[in-house]
């Protein structure tokens, strides 16, 4: 999978924000859709506080790596999927996170069966 293409797609979908904001779930988020957790040094930051461009890049690099690892956990043979499927599924995993994305049992089964037509219908 072309990681640069994945990064471009996710950055385009998410946007890039130096200031902490509330996502649609009213959780503090920063950078390129990075959900702030208690493990992050940004944890004490409030909405409107800012981080550097360098920190955004660090968070994004880490989040992309986690997303790809998560896809390899969720799907039997993720690396053998066609690139369009990899990009789509990785983007979904990035947006939703592994715990939520793992609940899409039919979608996961279709992907593992390489049933791309039914997968496309399921996720649209």
Task: Please name every model-derived segment.
Residues 1-3, 41, 82:
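Short, structured coil/loop segments at alpha-helix boundaries
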Residues 1-17, 25-26, 34-36, 51, ...:
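Long, amphipathic alpha-helical surface segments
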Residues 18-21, 73-85, 106, 122:
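Surface-exposed patches in mature extracellular/periplasmic domains of secreted proteins
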Residues 21-47, 84-85:
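Short, surface-exposed glycine/acidic/tryptophan-bearing loops
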Residues 29-31, 88-91, 118-119:
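Structural recognition of the beta-strand scaffold that forms the well-ordered cores
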Residues 43-75, 83-101:
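Alpha-helical segment that forms one wall of the substrate-binding/catalytic cleft
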